[in-house]
């Protein structure tokens, strides 16, 4: 890296929306606008749209999703006559700055787009897709599969697999297959952009001991509305850096649309729970900047409609936290009053008796001991009273317990 400024951001697992450069910029824009540090007419760059590409609809694939509960959305595009080669310096430096090793222009573009938008992509060698068929399904029998790292893995019946007309090609949302991946001789490719079930991806990643950039994001939740823009962005870069032409329409199978969340909030609760004075108008302004729409129900009540990319905001308390976060915790003054309600616990009689006996014995000079309930089996092995009654630990920390 010749010269660059790198920010390392610590994210909590619930903030899947900020696991990309676009997501961080979107959140930063909200804070800067509310604090009047930038002009109110400042906006993020428009997301790529279908009319940004020129399509030659000569080729097609038959795509089938076996279980829509495991694959919510599956999209892709065919690009032919590409030239696989090393990436230009600017792209290599971008990837190296975030700790990624450049491989070739096609793979590098998918990685770049992943970190740009937070949407995982995968490139298949089109000529390896036998029968022009893509099936998204789980294995029906025990079988082995060789991943990109050359390791042979036994598939589980719960794994989601991307298959062609003959066999498996990819561990969906986790890791690609060795045979179907892009190589230096690849001329035609199929770019996949999809949305898989987060729980299923997490189980597969843990089962096979794989923690990839793709699985990391799928486990935490991916924005369904970013599937197509990311695919278009990657296609634009591929045409620019490797040549070729688009030879299909955008395939987009979306059998079960992901709806926005909606629930009621009370403006008074924001003030009461947050512990600060904020007007309804300020609350509305913050939520509007966060792209959370409000439909006023009555005076201090409203229905909040939360965009799909904020899968961590599902309750009123989440809204309150968001308002406080953007308003600024440092701007919330600490009360000079402390309210407390002292209470005297009522102890059970047997505990009272025990305490009185303990106190009396201590006053006479005795010492009270609390022994570890865990002990060596050696100590009781010859005691008939305890033989065959001991409870063994499955995973003891040492031989002494």
Ranges and model annotations:
Residues 329, 335-401:
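Polar, glycine-rich mid-to-C-terminal structural blocks
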Residues 1-350, 355-357:
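RNA/tRNA-interacting regions in translation and RNA-turnover enzymes
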